[in-house]
Amino acid sequence: MPGRERRDGGRSADDNKQNDRNERRGGGRRDDRRNQQQDERSQYIERVVTINRVSKVVKGGRRFSFTALVIVGDGKGMVGVGYGKAKEVPAAIQKGAEEARKNFFRVPMVNGTITHPVQGEKAAGIVMLKPAAPGTGVIAGGAARPVLECAGIQDILSKSLGSDNAINVVHATVDGLKQLVRPEEVAARRGKTIEEVAPARILRARAGQEA
């Protein structure tokens, strides 16, 4: 019937409009979620230390994939290291960044430098870290520098004493940073005041920050 066809045609047009409206709504939510994730990523500093191609021998031949060692930090004392593996380089970097954010830890700092000298070790990697005076800058090379910069350290002296392997150096640097303690923690542990425990340099820096 012509009337029925017109009614059916009108109903199908309305359905199409409703579907288009729903798709636009869903797309808007996805866009908002994607923009929110991009804003969260933009708040952090990301450094790719190394990318390697690895292979796996299977029955049909070799399967190649990529690994990425990524450092992520907020530049304000939070830093993390992640290791990602995927068939494509961008996916490996993304996985490494996600793992790095899960491994965040806080680095105790006073006036832009670390609180005391430490030595970090991981496998054959050995990294020595020392506090530095304001204006010194980040004296570090190789794979240790991205870790210190992402953590927000402004003045530090470092030296690699062991293997030059980037993975070992990064994890040795992280091990050293995790050994750092605040002067308040040392004073509480020893049952003394901060003035009795902390060096004069740290006390002057704390006084300058409070002022």
UniProtKB/Swiss-Prot annotation:
One of its GO terms (molecular function) is rRNA binding. Residues 1-41 are annotated as: Disordered. GO terms for cellular component: small ribosomal subunit. Keywords: Ribonucleoprotein, Ribosomal protein, RNA-binding, rRNA-binding. It comes from the Bacteria. Residues 44-107 form the S5 DRBM domain. GO terms for biological process: translation. InterPro entries: Ribosomal_Su5_D2-typ_SF, Ribosomal_uS5, Ribosomal_uS5_bac-type, Ribosomal_uS5_C, Ribosomal_uS5_N, Ribosomal_uS5_N_CS, Ribsml_uS5_D2-typ_fold_subgr. NCBIfam families: rpsE_bact. With S4 and S12 plays an important role in translational accuracy. Part of the 30S ribosomal subunit. Contacts proteins S4 and S8. Belongs to the universal ribosomal protein uS5 family. The N-terminal domain interacts with the head of the 30S subunit; the C-terminal domain interacts with the body and contacts protein S4. The interaction surface between S4 and S5 is involved in control of translational fidelity. This is Small ribosomal subunit protein uS5. It comes from Corynebacterium glutamicum (strain ATCC 13032 / DSM 20300 / JCM 1318 / BCRC 11384 / CCUG 27702 / LMG 3730 / NBRC 12168 / NCIMB 10025 / NRRL B-2784 / 534). The gene is rpsE.
